UniProtKB/Swiss-Prot annotation:
The keyword Ion transport applies. Its EC number is 7.2.1.1. It comes from Chlamydia trachomatis serovar L2 (strain ATCC VR-902B / DSM 19102 / 434/Bu). It comes from the Bacteria. This is Na(+)-translocating NADH-quinone reductase subunit E. The chain crosses the membrane at residues 11-31, 50-70, 90-110, 123-143, 153-173, 191-211. The lineage of its organism: Bacteria, Pseudomonadati, Chlamydiota, Chlamydiia, Chlamydiales.
Amino acid sequence: MWLGDYSLLNLLGIFLQATFIQNILLSTFLGMCSYLACSSRLSTANGLGMSVALVLTITGSINWLVHYFITKPGALAWLSPALANIDLSFLELIMFIVVIAAFTQILELLLERFSRNLYLALGIFLPLIAVNCAILGGVLFGITRNYPFLPMVVFSLGSGCGWWLAIVLFATIREKLAYSDVPQHLRGTGISFITTGLMAMAFMGLTGIDISKPTTSKPAFVMNIATDSPQPNTHSSSEEPKAS
């Protein structure tokens, strides 16, 4: 339940997969609004990236607990056997969003108290983290892949770090583009989308590499043999003598 068939090496594979190979921004293009709006300065992009990574990691872990102990069909059986047939999965999406919004509000209060400059730099985009589709998408991806708890935490952290990496790289490029001779009709949004597309193509070169599969589980053919009914042995070395 907590680690499943995943080893520590598999956890590293999940992190690298979520960060580079299946980057949540450059492979699924989730969270593009704040990515484009808050990447004009590297310091602002770095602060927003750290915030998204933190929110995604914490809310991914909390929402895993919500899924497996509250909303999953039969999840309430730990309270009472009489509740085993209750299915609250229709509330799952709403509860996920509530958890994300609540933690985002906590983060906003902390930044306002301890990092006033970053709080003012992010502006309206800080509370909009609550509806950042990259965070909800990362949570849903982890839930639908049926990760145990620790792999879910690592996947959420990797997805958040991948989004952070993408916006920091993009902000670095945009600062260079400010001093470049960009054609007039491509300035602004045009060159931003072209740059993002080129970054996505670079990360797409890692497509096909899968290093996140568990390696401690039994091979499928062993389980099949164990579950199949025994077959008669037609190649026995000793045969019954035929009746004369």
